[in-house]
């Protein structure tokens, strides 16, 4: 599972929304870097960051590749995710299935994830074993075997994963259809990361090997080390194990522009497997890397004040009045391309879809017409920055957030000084961002309903 900087901080900010005392008493120094990461690049193009962490004698390695589901070839959705699975099927130094076994033997753990923008592999071990995991990861980066004899069995694993997580889950099916309705079924942002079933079945070893050859190069990767190891030792070991990998030109993300309108502006799905209705609405929106980038940080503040838990406008108007069981918003500005600003709500039993949708639209319209209050903006920023400090408590948060930021092409300062940047957002900027996106950006409104 991928947790972006926004998702990591948003989960902590939600805790602050539920507990105002935390937000009041946890304010970050405005110009102090969150992690104090050291940052350099090897001669072959590999970007490296190191985050000291001395609370426990452990170390973690995150290796991000700037290629996710959005980079899947046309007609082959799911290649990036399928390759993630096949990367555990051996390399010149590591036998099939031995990677995780060797990490576990040292008392560590490992995993991987694929998102729309990146594929990442990570391990955590006792600090003295850093060299071991660097050597193993560098080996499969340079020369993963991707053996043909394991292709069909792993395809079965991927298809079973899709069956369990999506096909047998009415809400997951609905959300998948909703994303495709907004962007288009074959647009890079509209395809599921795991892939459409028919396209998963068509993926060949050549597809996987070609993706590896194109994207799994040092100049297309970001390595983040966090832990209780001296910096000079980290530099020595990284250069020893990764420095010899042949340099290749970085692959460019080749993505179509955002469509001028939603593929399906309105989507209604009835499902006999669902009991509770679900309302979704999403707008295409700029990010920190695409579109009107100046709106990205204000949109983060807007998302929190509009639907960031208790005290937000949607919670007050929909949940506290008894119209909805839950209501919230989401926005991920940390994206390598255009992204979405979305709203979700579940009506209480007895509340009609029409009534809930009308109330939600009224909240949006009022915000567009009147803008947020200074108090709302200040409260949202206070909770978001407090959430940033709470996120520092987790051992893996730093490498995950730093790596995810660098891998989409943003500078290190974008995450290190995020509290200061978000604190500088003004009420007028939030109002301008809301008016730039909510009234006119391509959008999709959708309902999942029980069978009639």
Task: Walk through the language-model features, giving the residues of each.
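M16 family metallopeptidases and their MPP-like homologs
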Residues: 51, 56-80, 96-141, 171-198, ...
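N-terminal export signals
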Residues: 2, 7-24
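Sec-exported extracytoplasmic/periplasmic mature domains
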Residues: 87-92, 104, 108, 135-146, ...
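An aromatic/glycine/proline-enriched structural segment found at the starts
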Residues: 185, 189, 193, 218, ...
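Mature N-terminal segment immediately following signal peptide/propeptide cleavage
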Residues: 32-60
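Cleaved targeting-peptide boundary
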Residues: 24-30
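Active-site SXXK
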Residues: 77-91
């Amino acid at each position: 599972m991928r947790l972006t900087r926004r998702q990591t901080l948003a989960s902590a900010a939600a805790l602050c929304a539920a507990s105002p005392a935390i937000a009041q008493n946890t304010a970050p120094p405005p110009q102090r870097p969150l992690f104090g990461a050291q940052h350099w690049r090897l001669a072959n193009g590999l970007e490296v960051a190191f985050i000291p962490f001395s609370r426990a004698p452990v170390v973690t390695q995150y290796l991000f590749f700037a290629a996710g589901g959005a980079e899947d070839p046309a007609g082959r959705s799911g290649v990036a995710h399928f390759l993630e699975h096949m990367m555990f099927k051996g390399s010149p130094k590591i036998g099939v299935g031995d990677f995780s076994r060797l990490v576990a033997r040292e008392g560590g753990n490992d995993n991987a994830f694929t998102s729309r923008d990146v594929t990442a592999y990570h391990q955590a071990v006792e600090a003295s074993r850093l060299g071991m995991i660097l050597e193993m990861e560098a080996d499969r980066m340079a020369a993963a075997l991707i053996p043909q004899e394991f292709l069909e069995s792993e395809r079965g694993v991927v298809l079973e994963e899709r069956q369990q997580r999506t096909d047998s889950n009415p809400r997951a099916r609905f959300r998948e259809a909703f994303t495709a309705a907004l962007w288009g079924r074959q647009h890079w942002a509209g395809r599921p990361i795991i892939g459409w079933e028919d396209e998963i079945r068509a993926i060949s070893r050549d597809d996987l090997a070609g993706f590896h050859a194109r994207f799994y190069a040092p100049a297309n990767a970001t390595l983040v080390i966090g832990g209780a190891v001296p910096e000079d030792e980290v530099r020595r070991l990284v250069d020893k194990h990764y420095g010899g990998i042949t340099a290749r030109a970085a692959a460019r993300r080749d993505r179509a522009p955002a469509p001028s309108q939603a593929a399906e502006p309105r989507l209604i799905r009835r499902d006999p497997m669902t009991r509770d209705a679900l309302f979704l609405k999403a707008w295409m929106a700029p990010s920190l890397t695409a579109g009107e980038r100046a709106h990205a940080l204000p949109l983060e503040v807007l998302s929190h004040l509009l639907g960031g838990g208790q005290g937000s406008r949607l919670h007050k108007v929909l949940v506290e009045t008894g119209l909805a069981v839950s209501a919230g918003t989401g926005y991920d500005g940390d994206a390598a391309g255009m992204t979405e600003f979305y709203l979700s709500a579940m009506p209480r039993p007895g509340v009609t879809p029409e009534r809930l949708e009308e109330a939600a639209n009224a909240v949006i319209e009022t915000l567009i017409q009147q803008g947020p209050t200074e108090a709302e903006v200040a409260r949202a920023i206070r909770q978001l920055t407090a959430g940033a400090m709470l996120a520092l408590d987790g051992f893996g948060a730093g490498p995950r957030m730093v790596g995810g930021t660098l891998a989409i092409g943003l500078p290190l300062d974008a995450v290190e000084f995020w509290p200061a940047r978000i604190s500088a957002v003004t009420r007028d900027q939030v109002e301008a961002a809301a008016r730039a996106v909510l009234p006119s950006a391509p959008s999709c409104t959708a309902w999942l309903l029980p069978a009639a």
